[in-house]
Each structure stands twice: as C-alpha cells, then as structure tokens.
C-alpha cells in the first residue's frame, strides 16, 4: 500500500486528498477491502485526511463503516482511540446493512445471469 502511495503521489502527481467520482478518498480505500492500518495512520497522523465520517456518494460508506464492514478491528480500534469514539451509532449500522443488501443484490443478479446462460 505504501508503494502504491509513492506511485500515486510522486510519479503521477496525484494529491492524497484526491476524491473519486463517488466522493471516496484514500482514507476510504485504506479502510476498505485492502485494510491498511499503516496507511490509515499515515493519512490521519499527518492531517492529510482525518474525517472518518465522510460519506461516499455511492453507498454512503464512511471510512469507519468500511473498516467495520471489512472486519478491520485494528483500524476500528485505532479510530476509537484517536477520535474518542465510545460507540457506533445506529446510523453507522444502517450504512453497513445497506452495503450488505447491495452486495447481495449484485450476487443474486450475477447468479441469475449465469443460470439463464446455462439454460440456453
């Protein structure tokens, strides 16, 4: 992940504060599927990206809900300590539930497509 950071920042000249089309940023990526506590700490400790409640527009994911969704306990624990979080709100859980529903719909649509293809 740090090598990717070097590539993006130094070789391509893309700022770390760059946002994707859906509003996600490097902190969202670091808390998502790849889950890199090292990257999260780098972004937060250097005050590059510190808003753990910033929503992406596609699913409404925040870095915190992504870390919870992808089971990155180390990142969640770091956020709890760094930002003095005492509990996860129902609103955060709703975002996670919406993500699960969306993933299920995608899986169901893919499964249905392949079932239809095998009937032809």
UniProtKB/Swiss-Prot annotation:
ANK repeat residue numbers: 22-52, 59-88
UniProt-listed SMART domains: ANK (SM00248)
Signal peptide per UniProt: none
Keyword terms, alphabetized: ANK repeat, Repeat
Coiled-coil ranges per UniProt: none
InterPro entries, A to Z: Ankyrin_rpt (IPR002110), Ankyrin_rpt-contain_sf (IPR036770)
Keyword Repeat in annotation: yes
Stored SUPFAM superfamilies: Ankyrin repeat
Pfam families the record matches: Ank_2
Protein name as it appears in the record: Putative ankyrin repeat protein RBE_1215
Organism expressing this protein natively: Rickettsia bellii (strain RML369-C)
């Amino acid at each position: 992940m740090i090598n990717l950071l070097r590539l993006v920042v130094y070789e391509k000249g893309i700022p770390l504060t760059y946002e994707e089309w859906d509003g996600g940023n490097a902190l969202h990526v670091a808390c998502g599927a790849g889950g890199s506590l090292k990257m999260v700490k780098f972004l937060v400790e250097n005050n590059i990206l510190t808003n753990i409640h910033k929503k992406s527009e596609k699913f409404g994911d925040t870095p915190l809900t992504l870390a919870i969704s992808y089971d990155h306990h180390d990142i969640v624990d770091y956020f709890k300590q760094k930002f003095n979080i005492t509990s996860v709100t129902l609103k955060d859980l709703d975002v996670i539930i919406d993500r699960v529903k969306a993933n299920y719909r995608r899986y169901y649509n893919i499964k249905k497509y392949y079932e239809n293809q095998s009937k032809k």
